[in-house]
Amino acid sequence: MKDISRLALVLTVIAAGAGLILSLVEGVTREPIAEQRRLQTLKALQAVLPPIDNAPDADTVSLVTGKDKKGRDISRTFYRGRQANDLAGVAFKVIAPDGYSGNIEIMVGITPEGTVNGIEILTHAETPGLGSKIVEPWFKEQFRGKGLEDADWRVKKDGGGFDQITGATISPRAVVTAVRKGLEFFREHRQQIIEAGRSEG
């Protein structure tokens, strides 16, 4: 009985020590991880927006886009890029939930009129050498200059205007659909996104 009590005490001390170490590590790494995410967002914004002279992550509008499974609001942040204080472009993230291997997160940059300036794939788990080719410049470049009215927002295999990837139609189809839905949301809420007062991001 004495050995069991001693063993329980030792295990308790080890568990408490491990918990303390984990909380210290989390505390030390929280800020660097947040800063890394911010830098990733800024890099994507620079890639998809036209030349700007403001900090788009400090000129944002957040709108509720729906509800999650628990009934909580889902919001989308719109980053506004300006040149000489005039709106030059808007960027926002979209999620393609129907990628071959899960979610594909995309940053979309558009003109104030709703034409795509560029897209950047932020995260994906698509098959290397197949679906992963959605990150290649030739694939992303075909979105530039396209709007809802002047493009058929389907891959060519489905009769649309976007090239798919040989052997991997699901990933490109998911990206095209997500970008189209993002453009539709922007069109529905354009005035609110463009004219809302600036808020700190």
Give the ranges of each region predicted by the language model.
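Flexible, solvent-exposed loop/hinge segments and secondary-structure transition points
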Residues: 2-201
